[in-house]
From Swiss-Prot:
It is a multi-pass membrane protein. It comes from Mycosarcoma maydis. The keyword Transmembrane helix applies. This is Protein YOP1. Its main location: endoplasmic reticulum. The keyword Transmembrane helix applies. Required to generate and maintain the structure of the tubular endoplasmic reticulum network and the vacuole. Induces high curvature in membranes and causes membrane tubule formation. Involved in membrane/vesicle trafficking. It comes from the Eukaryota. The chain crosses the membrane at residues 40-59, 61-80, 91-107, 111-129.
Length: 172
């Protein structure tokens, strides 16, 4: 039993060390760790735990999911704009199109969503899936749903505009 507990402790320590290594890439978190006597990995895990509990128990869940859906992608979008590679620009531009569409649609069905248990937990997971470059969620939604609808709509609009005679310019 003690050997199993020691194995679990080693795995947890390795996991925390990996998180600390990843978080060390961000100067703001390094500065945070120097200012506050809490290791950045523990602070990040604590913040993640509190965020998860709040969303799960629907405490300011709408605000928190929109905060996650805006600030994290906004940060990486700004970084992408400053980088020379166009691929990361595509990732974040696609994310914003999908996120914007879902946010827009959500305003119309908000009354129905109130009755769906764990809606904000599901929404949080969806936002994470959409934004992670590893999952390419936004790209998948865009290419399978939004793009085909857009191309069909665009074609219809162009045909309607082509068949409509131009109005004469007003002269005064």
């Amino acid at each position: 039993m003690a050997a199993q507990a020691q194995q679990i402790q080693q795995k947890v320590e390795y996991f925390v060390a990996q998180i600390d290594k990843e978080l060390s890439r961000y100067p703001a978190l390094k500065k945070f760790e120097q200012t506050v006597p809490v290791p950045k990995a523990y602070a990040a895990l604590g913040a993640f735990g509190i965020f998860t509990l709040f969303v799960f128990f629907n405490i300011a869940a709408g605000f928190l999911t929109n905060l996650l859906g805006f600030f994290v992608p906004a940060y990486f979008s700004l970084k992408a704009l400053e980088s020379p590679q166009p691929q990361d620009d595509i990732q974040w531009l696609t994310y914003w199109v999908v996120f914007g569409l879902f946010t827009f649609l959500e305003t119309f069905i908000n009354i129905v969503l109130y009755y769906i248990p764990w809606y904000y937990t599901i929404k949080t997971l969806a936002i994470v899936w959409l934004m992670l470059p590893q999952t390419q969620g936004a790209k998948m939604v865009y290419s399978r749903i939004i793009r085909p609808v857009f191309l069909t709509t665009q074609k219809t609009v162009h045909q309607a505009n082509a068949s409509t005679p131009a109005a004469p310019a007003e002269t005064h």
